[in-house]
A protein has these predicted regions:
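A cross-family detector of function-defining hotspots
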Residues: 34-37, 43-72, 77-118, 123-127, ...
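Sec-dependent N-terminal signal peptides of Gram-positive bacterial secreted proteins and lipoproteins
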Residues: 1-26
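Sec-dependent signal peptide cleavage junction
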Residues: 18-36, 40
């Protein structure tokens, strides 16, 4: 608490002496304060860390199925055909046998052997789309925590997963947030 008061006093003092535009400084102060709070949260035991998720037995089912609306991007659900995605969203910016891309949003298929061109995963790599709950690439992980709650899994690469999965397997059905620093860098929805 004492540290916050000292930092706040220094920032206000610098503003008074410098004569900068206060609107810009208020935005800077808000962002700086947010970073300080996020760093403090990361140091607490309440912040999700990978080592807090290692107590499960291999093969144990963990988490719950997310609501259908959480498993959609731009009105597209897992299981839609590529043709229905194109009918809904128009001509993609890129198309391969493994997926179709609209700007920073990819609808792909990782399954093989007899599975047609259906959407088995969706990936957001920029601010072209948001999740049903309003999270976008570039948002803070603290915002993800506030909106989605504690993740069902944090892996060794610090990716946060929400949904249902079988521990120590690749059987997962849900949404995953990858991060760089304290910001969302990629969002994946898959089964």
């Amino acid at each position: 608490m004492k540290r916050k008061c000292i930092i706040t006093g220094l920032v206000i003092g610098l503003q008074l002496v410098s004569g900068y535009n206060y609107v810009t400084d208020a935005s800077w102060l808000s962002k700086t304060w947010d970073r300080l709070e996020t760093n403090a949260a990361k140091q607490s035991n309440d912040w999700p860390k990978a080592e807090q998720y290692t107590h499960y037995v291999g093969g144990q089912i963990v988490g719950d199925t997310l609501p259908e609306e959480d498993m959609m991007i731009l009105g597209v659900s897992l299981g839609n055909t590529f043709d229905s995605v194109k009918a809904s969203l128009g001509q993609p910016t890129k198309e391969t046998s493994r997926g179709i891309t609209y700007g920073g949003v990819t609808f792909g298929n990782l399954k093989m052997d007899g599975v047609g061109p259906i959407v088995t995963y969706m990936m957001i790599e920029n601010r072209d789309a948001v999740t049903h709950r309003g999270i976008a690439v570039g948002d803070s992980m603290r915002k993800v925590l506030n909106v989605y709650g504690r993740p069902d899994l944090v892996d060794s690469n610090n990716r946060w997963f929400y949904g249902k999965y079988r521990y120590r397997t690749d059987m997962m059905h849900g949404i995953q947030f990858e991060q760089k620093g304290d910001k969302v860098s990629k969002i994946l929805i898959y089964r």
